[in-house]
Amino acid sequence: MRFSRVALTCLCGFLGLTILACSRPGGASKKVAFVTNNAADFWTIARKGCEQADRELADVEVEFKIPSDGTAGEQRRIVDDLLAKGIGGIAISPVDPANQTQMINEIAKQVLVITQDSDAPQSDRACYLGTDNVAAGRQAGELIKEALPQGGRVMVFVGKIDARNAQERYQGIKETLQGSKVEIIDVRSDDTDRVRAKSNVADTLVKYPDVAGLVGLWSYNGPAILNAVRDAGKIGQVKIICFDEEDETLAGVKDGAVYATVVQQPYEFGYQSVHLLAKLLGGDRSVIPANKQKIIPTLIIKHDNVDEFTAKINRLRGRG
């Protein structure tokens, strides 16, 4: 089924963005939803994957939900709205897995639930689909050591350190840096506030003038770091390692301001989540691995492969 009509609805009171697939003649027998954890550009690519899966599956209708303020409370309101509409399956990236486990368990008693991007392993979700974030953190850790062969002090930035994907990436980084000459000063969180994300970096550059590296764990942290470093006139003096494929991050990799970025494959998050939900709703449980995890591998983007990767991402974003 095609996303032949796309509606952007600003929900009063909590500004949740909703992108709806229109119903095909006669109605779809499987209604599923993909719920993000914030409004980052990262999810634009995931939406393309959802749209492609929706086109391929004749009996599926997909709703794509974006909690613009990135809170667990807004995710709950979105889910309640989906349940009221009679949704059959939900793929959600929980903002705060530990404190949302009960919510996920309640939902799982009513409809099929999988987690994507950020897992809640203690919940009753049917499966997790996404990155092995510990492994991705280890990749970032190796890049930090590579960028700082003489060692140095680094600061880590993230939206919410309580999010499982953030915790696991940080765990992987710490494991890899253990015993090295690199010292982690601390982790600064911004609660998905982009202005605060940049000010956290600016404050760090002032408070720790000897800082050698800045690490961003979430997609928008890369541009926040880059812009703060540029404003401080320290491009080239501080090594930047980040995650995901924001435009500014990729441009920074191309011009050398960003050493490298570890990218996920959000298109596959969307595409495979919809297909997985459709198969499970059709009664096929064989698609769930024994460990209940479907891992989508991460990629390392550096100066030598950034042009090719950027061209691919731009195609997915509909830019050419």
Residue positions per predicted region:
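Short, low-complexity disordered leader/linker segments with a strong preference
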Residues: 1-31, 105-109, 319-320
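Hinge/cleft segment of the Venus flytrap/periplasmic-binding protein
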Residues: 22, 157, 161, 165, ...
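Hydrophobic alpha-helical segments within soluble ligand-binding/sensing domains
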Residues: 27, 75, 129-154, 196-198, ...
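Extracytoplasmic "Venus flytrap"
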Residues: 31-57, 63-77, 87, 93-97, ...
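Short, solvent-exposed amphipathic alpha-helices that sit
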Residues: 42-56, 60, 136-140, 164-182, ...
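Hydrophobic alpha-helical
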Residues: 91-107, 173, 185, 191-252
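Flexible loop/hinge segments that line or gate small-molecule binding clefts
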Residues: 97-135, 143-146, 153, 244-254, ...
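Flexible loop/turn connectors
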Residues: 235-236, 243-301
